Design a protein with these regions (language model features):
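Solvent-exposed loop/turn segments at secondary-structure junctions
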Residues: 22-26, 75-79, 97, 104-108, ...
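Surface-exposed patches in mature extracellular/periplasmic domains of secreted proteins
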Residues: 49-57, 100-103, 121-129
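Sec-exported extracytoplasmic/periplasmic mature domains
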Residues: 43-47, 93-96, 115-119, 207-208
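Short, surface-exposed beta-strand/loop micro-motifs that present aromatic residues
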Residues: 59-60, 151-167
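Sec-dependent N-terminal signal peptides
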Residues: 1-12
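Aromatic-Pro/Gly-enriched surface loop or interdomain linker
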Residues: 13-69, 73-76, 166, 174-175, ...
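Acidic, glycine-rich loop-and-strand cores that form catalytic or ligand-binding grooves
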Residues: 112-143
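Short alpha-beta junction capping motif
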Residues: 17, 69-108
Length: 209
């Protein structure tokens, strides 16, 4: 039933996105200006028609199936119940897409929870030749470094189900920080533009895959 519902939803609500709400104590609501700014940029630059007021959706909710893409971020702990993990798994294998932005502190928690969702699938680094880096905007060197916490190189990881990328995880990039209002982190305009361009690539890929 959920698989059928998703196929209907993706055609009916193809211009809607949501922020993923989760338990565990982490701040799923971090970067409140990020998604609205990304939506505005995408609507202007890749001709999407996304609602300017994104909603939040819980991991275990059937409403998850209304959205072709959901965004997840935070700094701390993440916890999925078995039912939530199953709901997210069905959503992803049925055509949904999850973007996770490591807001520095999320990594050690989200990796454990993703194993609940896909016990037999490992996160893999995505090659720069992958279409997600080559939509309207080309990133032939991979993810841009947005927020410098250390000297680690930014990496894009993914979960692939039957050859299809269902989850994109930006690690050590802090991509969603670059989507926020300029006054929040004082990132240079050039850095913010790169972040928004990569973000719009993610949306474009999720909508057209």
């Amino acid at each position: 039933m959920k698989i059928l519902f998703l196929s209907i939803s993706l055609s009916t609500f193809a211009q809607e996105v949501a922020v993923l709400k989760y338990n565990g104590g982490g701040d799923w609501y971090a970067n409140p200006t990020a998604i609205p700014n990304l939506i505005d940029f995408s609507n202007k630059n890749i001709k999407t028609l996304i609602s300017k007021n994104p909603t939040s959706v819980s991991v275990g909710s059937s409403d998850l199936f209304n959205f072709p893409i959901v965004f997840m971020t935070g700094h701390g702990n993440v916890f999925f119940t078995d039912k939530e993990a199953e709901n997210l798994r069905v959503y992803l294998i049925s055509g949904g897409f999850l973007h996770i932005s490591d807001n520095y502190g999320l990594d050690k928690y989200i990796r454990i929870q993703l194993k609940k969702v896909f016990p037999k699938i490992e996160l893999k680094e995505i090659p720069f030749s992958h279409p997600i880096f080559n939509q309207t905007f080309t990133f032939n060197k991979g993810l841009p470094k947005i927020h410098e916490h250390n000297k680690k190189v930014p990496q894009g990881f993914g979960l692939f189900f039957k050859g299809r990328l269902v989850c994109f995880y930006d690690y050590e990039s802090d991509l969603s920080d670059g989507w926020e209002d300029s006054t929040v982190h004082n990132n240079p305009m050039e850095t913010r533009i790169k972040a928004l361009q990569m973000g719009s690539n993610i949306i474009e890929y999720a909508f057209r895959k």
